[in-house]
Amino acid sequence: MRRGGWRKRTENDGWEKWGGYMAAKVQKLEEQFRTDAANQKDGTASAIFSGVAIYVNGYTDPSAEELRNLMMLHGGQYHVYYSRSKTTHIIATNLPNAKIKELKGEKVIRPEWIVESIKAGRLLSSAPYQLYTKPSAAQKSLNFNPVCKPEDPGPGPSNRAKQLNNRVNHIIKKIETESEVKANGLSSWNEDGVNDDFSFEDLEHTFPGRKQNGVMHPRDTAVIFNGHTHSSNGALKTQDCLVPVGNSVASRLSLDSTQEEKRAEKSNADFRDCTVQHLQHSTRSADALRSPHRTNSLSPSLHSNTKINGAHHSTVQGPSSTKSTSVLTLSKVAPSVPSKPSDCNFISDFYSRSRLHHISTWKCELTEFVNTLQRQSSGIFPGREKLKKVKTGRSSLVVTDTGTMSVLSSPRHQSCVMHVDMDCFFVSVGIRNRPDLKGKPVAVTSNRGTGTAPLRPGANPQLEWQYYQNRALRGKAADIPDSSVWENQDSTQTNGIDSVLSKAEIASCSYEARQVGIKNGMFFGYAKQLCPNLQAVPYDFHACREVAQAMYETLASYTHSIEAVSCDEALIDVTDILAETKLSPEEFAAALRIEIKDKTKCAASVGIGSNILLARMATKKAKPDGQYHLQPDEVDDFIRGQLVTNLPGVGRSMESKLASLGIKTCGDLQCLTMAKLQKEFGPKTGQMLYRFCRGLDDRPVRTEKERKSVSAEINYGIRFTQPKEAEAFLLSLSEEIQRRLEAAGMKGKRLTLKIMVRKPGAPIETAKFGGHGICDNIARTVTLDQATDSAKIIGKATLNMFHTMKLNISDMRGVGIQVNQLVPANSNLSTCSSRPSAQSSLFSGRPHSVRDLFQLQKAKKPTEEEHKEVFLAAVDLEVSSTSRACGLLSPLSAHLAASVSPDTNSGECSRKWNGLHSPVSGQSRLNLSIEVPSPSQIDQSVLEALPLDLREQIEQVCAAQQGEPRGKKKEPVNGCSSGVLPHPVGTVLLQIPEPQEPCNSDSKISVIALPAFSQVDPDVFAALPAELQKELKAAYDQRQRQGEDTTHQQPTSTSVPKNPLLQLKPPAMKDKRNKRKNLIGSPRKSPLKNKLLSSPAKTLPGAYGSPQKLMDGFLQHEGMASERPLEEVSASTPGAQDLSSLLPGQSSCFRPAAPNLAGAVEFSDVKTLLKEWITTISDPMEEDILQVVRYCTDLIEEKDLEKLDLVIKYMKRLMQQSVESVWNMAFDFILDNVQVVLQQTYGSTLKVT
């Protein structure tokens, strides 16, 4: 192989100029090594390795970092990059044949030479420790097959799997037939068999290299790892996996030919299976997160072949590189960032390296671990038994923080919560086997260099930095600064090469680093400027998982009342433990911390308090590596001095708002009354702040948490050039969503597609390599017909939303899919069998959030007619089912009506305007006056599924309906002054007395609202049972008589009942009513007068002009009554309001006040009201949304579509800005139903953009 061949093949990769950048870098690394050596030397230092310069190639034990430290302490030199002229010894455990040939007689020494020389106190001869000796001409060697030259084209994709299999088989057969392998005079298949020939070069010919960070790496490019692949806390040695049992050369020589052939076949299969398992495990490994310029190896058998002649060099960035648990993947040694998002393993690679993904996954696993413990608990806790034994032999004296002795008071059996939190979790795990780094500033990050990175063309870090500073001050209204006035002020000149500070984020930093101003989340480049001695260590996900599991297993040995907060912290209720063991909280906390430290070698701090809030605050005082018990008598003084930012739920936005009120501490916050806080922050948040600032917290330690959503989002490395790439990526992300839904055992119904798009004016190239930069966030949401976990369905819906966005593909910087409205995978809410339970739960009397309303709304496929019924069922809080029976009542409405109790009380009555009910209070949501429909409308299967007591009540009401005296006038009583409120003109009331007092006029009355008969389809009416036809006819006759009795009554007015959550400003009371023009001889202007979602002018054009065409006799009553007052005004209902139309010949009529939202009429007032509602409440109530829907439909009735359009668009902007996804759901609900009304009224819909 020509020496210059590699240089020719990699002339464009930017690494060939050794005389410039690399020479300066090597010199800088050597100077840094000498500086560190001077600082590290102490009494144990020596000069054993004076004049020795080592270079570590691949995996070694001790690791490369440990060898570096040993050379530093004992006078040697450590070279990150091999130099033929300067390096004296190459340290390696194993090398493939290609590298052995390239060394050409260089000294390759085992790492034991260094260790044993230090033990002996002198420099030992390296001859006995040579890894390979130069073979003589008489020495036999393996007959290696020639491998493909790097210049040769790689195999086609269709033949890769076959060629890999043939290659493995060929290698094994060659190994099996060889008689001996000389390595240092010893026969060793492990050292010179498979590892020499089955090299990574062969795999690369089968799976050609991909672009890494935009640069195509040649197949024989050396990627030198210097031992950074071995984790001292238990990295796997897959060499053992790759060696079949009984494959020793000596053992094979003793076998006869038959046995040898059998063993060859078995070894072939074993080796192939083991190799495949290793490669699959490597691909799935979560420990492969590394910097963009680093790729690591785990197995010495899979090193890439390396030229050690100065042409090849490592991509390790600096001498501070340390051990890692990176696992080799099949695709170019697990490149830190796959070349393109369109690659099939891009998503899996990204999540295998994502710290946040691992943290969230671990939390779910630990939560499930705790739940499993509780389900399988036998009540036996080994930890408690140990504590009891320890308690008998211990004194009640403990040493306090001040060093004095104090007698612990006897434990009191009061509520006690402990917050266990590991100190600097990622750092503690990373250095637990690194005593040389303890006590030094350490940070866990993906960058292990000097804190700088090359400046890429087109990037403008200073502009991005200024933009984010402006955004912190001005919020989302911040503009992008003019790029022409900004220069790269954070760039530096390093060896003549422009560079910028590294944007790698610090995941965790030690307390020593925090003392100089370094914080978690800070960019490593800036942190390196604050602390030049900052040591960077890599992520060790495997070890972190082990430590987290060990901590939770320790806690579980004492109690199962555990709330998994994160992988490194947990809340436990220790009240029972203290009562059983008779220990004080301080004693138990000390024992717990000692046990955790013994098992994990990591320190944990414990905060103790009477509730979760105080325990968390106590932990902050206990850190680092301590414990603190916040006594009840100390709470008041302690809490007053705490900053409000220490309270849960107080973020930057709320902090700035509190600061504007002059509040910085909890003591300041205590000066405000609850009314003031609720006015400023809303009812829930105001009450929360009022309690938390006083140390009050009634939250229990929750072991189970309901999962609200499943999502997969990627905002790193997203760069598309064609729409097909983006579409393929969305389909791949949909498959990831399917895997996560299946793992969670859930299905989702609502999909949200989130796209990050480069903000206009932002730099095309981001300051952080592969980052998203300055972006706008765009989201689209769709609700599926049924809950699903199918990637095919999710992908199709996602692509439809994506196509509607019409984005510039090259500007996409992030993609995410979120699934809401989760249901268990073994249930199906869309089937009829599950509908009764879901609906009856809505009317169980307990408060419900808007999510329940949406779940009810989407319980059936929303065809046009069914959509009407669902909407009415959601809006009509009285669920007047019979009013929709004449309009072909849907099964859903019947189920709703049949699943509730008919009982009515004075606090559960509501007013209805134009078919819409206004809620009375937040406490009576959906628990209002629910009437039972006629017997013919009740589904018997639903009735039989109801509880016995409820079913008996409904049967009694039905019996009373059949025996009800017709034509007798009923009056509401029992103080239900608002129970029988005026209904819109054209509505018929069926009044049904309670079965207990069927003949008593003072009994309770259930009122069922029927539409005007002009709304009834004659064919539908004719198809009804004769009994129901008689019942309806009697009701309309009764309506006619009531109209005659109330013709001369004067209407009285009351204000519409207001929702307390929407009553943010007092509504104006209007007693004067506007006059309408004479409507003689003309149909009504709006169908909302009769029924909300039906237009008589469109559906029944002849209903008003000639009712005789429908049904003789019965329609005459309707024709006479349709233009007369309808409502019955009782003396016991002084607040009732008469909404009646004029008889023919009258010149005017009364109507409700102008459309208002909780009293707000002007658009400016409505905007203020909506903004306060949306920004102060995180979970809107059903009645709030329904009241907004009612306001919008009132605007439609008044034909004020201009204001309606402004209101809808303003709500859309506000709700999309909210971080709560439920607000988007609320807006979609409002918009869907407004569009239905518009479509029925005007034959068109609003165009909302």
UniProtKB/Swiss-Prot annotation:
Enzyme group, top EC level? Answer: transferase
A molecular-function term among this protein's GO annotations: deoxycytidyl transferase activity
Is ATP-binding one of the keywords? Answer: no
Q: Name one GO cellular component term.
A: nucleus
Q: Mind telling me which SUPFAM superfamilies this protein's record contains?
A: BRCT domain (SSF52113), DNA/RNA polymerases (SSF56672), Lesion bypass DNA polymerase (Y-family), little finger domain (SSF100879)
Instruction: Write out the GO biological process terms.
Output: error-prone translesion synthesis; response to UV
Limits of the BRCT domain: 44-131
| Residues annotated as domain UmuC | 417-651
Q: What is its main location?
A: nucleus
Name the residue ranges of motif: Nuclear localization signal: 1072-1078
Quote the subcellular location field of this record.
Nucleus
Compositionally skewed regions (Polar residues) per UniProt: 294-319, 1048-1057
Tissue specificity, please?
Ubiquitous.
Which Pfam families does this entry report, sorted A to Z?
BRCT_2, IMS, IMS_C, IMS_HHH_1, REV1_C, UBM
Q: Where is this site: Interaction with target DNA?
A: K768, T781
Specify the domain of life of the species encoding this protein: Eukaryota
Query: According to the UniProt record, where is the region Protein interaction domain?
Result: 1150-1249
Residues the entry annotates as binding dCTP = 355, 421-425, 508-514, 520, 568
Q: Where does Mg(2+) 1 bind?
A: D421, D568, E569
Assigned keywords, A-Z: DNA damage, DNA repair, DNA synthesis, DNA-binding, Magnesium, Metal-binding, Nucleotidyltransferase, Nucleus, Transferase
| Binding locations of Mg(2+) 2 | D421
The enzyme's E.C. designation: 2.7.7.-
State the similarity comment. Answer: Belongs to the DNA polymerase type-Y family.
Q: Write out the function statement from the record.
A: Deoxycytidyl transferase involved in DNA repair. Transfers a dCMP residue from dCTP to the 3'-end of a DNA primer in a template-dependent reaction. May assist in the first step in the bypass of abasic lesions by the insertion of a nucleotide opposite the lesion. Required for normal induction of mutations by physical and chemical agents.
Domain comment, in the record's words? The C-terminal domain is necessary for protein interactions.
Q: What is this protein called?
A: DNA repair protein REV1
The record lists the organism as Mus musculus (Mouse)
